[in-house]
């Protein structure tokens, strides 16, 4: 296990959206559908947040281009994280408490910082990126994976025509 390092433990990736948020960087909040361009996070530090109707539960979205420190991450495209810091019960304790006691993902049935794989049964890191090798160019309430909160309610935003532009 190389932890968060790639390239057999020799190369750290750039900080991701979760780490940047924990360090105090504020994401741009998306509240409606629009045509957007998301630059690689290492170039601008820019990432999006989409809130659910449940306070403290939201999604973070970032772009990776697989260059520089990210040359060993195994892919490129948009990454999506489902974050839960709410009052939801996640294995007998509240999700917000899991963050306080450093047990964020220790309950596998309700991870509180979950990478949403573009291909839900991904077995290879290349399959987690949107559109990625699976050419998954949509992310919405009724797509698979679903863009919903833990109660299966849609978030009110959808992404169509996800693509990587040169």
Describe the residue ranges of each PLM region.
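Post-HExxH zinc-binding segment in Zn-dependent metallohydrolases
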Residues: 1-25
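Non-catalytic C-terminal accessory/binding modules of secreted extracellular proteins
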Residues: 28-166
């Amino acid at each position: 296990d190389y932890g968060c390092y790639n390239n057999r433990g020799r190369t750290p990736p750039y900080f991701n959206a979760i780490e940047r948020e924990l360090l105090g960087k504020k994401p741009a909040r998306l509240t409606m559908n629009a045509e957007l361009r998301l630059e690689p996070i290492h170039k601008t530090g820019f990432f999006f947040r989409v809130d659910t109707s449940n306070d403290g539960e939201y999604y973070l979205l970032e772009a990776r281009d697989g260059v520089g420190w990210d040359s060993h991450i195994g892919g490129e495209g948009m990454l999506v994280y489902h974050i839960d810091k709410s009052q939801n019960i996640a294995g007998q304790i509240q999700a917000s408490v899991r963050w306080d006691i450093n047990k964020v993902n220790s309950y596998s049935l309700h991870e509180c910082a979950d990478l949403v794989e573009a291909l839900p049964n991904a077995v290879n890191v290349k399959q987690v990126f949107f559109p990625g090798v699976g050419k998954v160019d949509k992310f919405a309430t009724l797509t698979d994976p679903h863009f919903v909160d833990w109660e299966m309610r849609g978030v009110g935003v959808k992404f169509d025509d996800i693509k990587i532009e040169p």
